[in-house]
From Swiss-Prot:
The gene is srp19. The keyword Nucleotide-binding does not apply. It holds the Pfam family SRP19. This is Signal recognition particle 19 kDa protein. GO terms for biological process: SRP-dependent cotranslational protein targeting to membrane. Involved in targeting and insertion of nascent membrane proteins into the cytoplasmic membrane. Binds directly to 7S RNA and mediates binding of the 54 kDa subunit of the SRP. GO terms for molecular function: 7S RNA binding.
Length: 95
């Protein structure tokens, strides 16, 4: 999904505990268990992306979950490629 010249990256896209039917876009083997907004922000900074954070929003299909927020990443890359890079970087941060 695009927003103002960028890609919207919801935490759900990277979360291995969320089924694909609820919004995860990565294979479970490449996804991350319960990523936080701060981890994703650190990963984006390490990867050198420009972004904007929206902390007060919830993913529509999972409106009842506590975790919230999304990030608009300024890139022309496909969303899946971006999500793979970010998930890999989050895994590196957790080591």
């Amino acid at each position: 999904m695009k927003k103002r010249g960028g890609r919207i990256l919801w935490l759900v896209y990277l979360d291995s505990s969320v089924p694909r039917s609820r919004g995860r876009i990565l294979p479970r083997s490449k996804a991350v268990s319960k990523p936080t907004l701060q981890e994703v922000i650190q990963a984006l900074e390490r990867l050198g992306y420009r972004y904007q954070v929206y902390q007060d929003k919830k993913y529509p299909a999972l409106w009842f979950e506590e975790r919230q927020g999304y990030i608009v990443v300024e890139t022309s890359e496909k969303l899946r490629i971006l999500a793979l890079k970010v998930a890999e970087e989050v895994r590196k941060l957790r080591r």
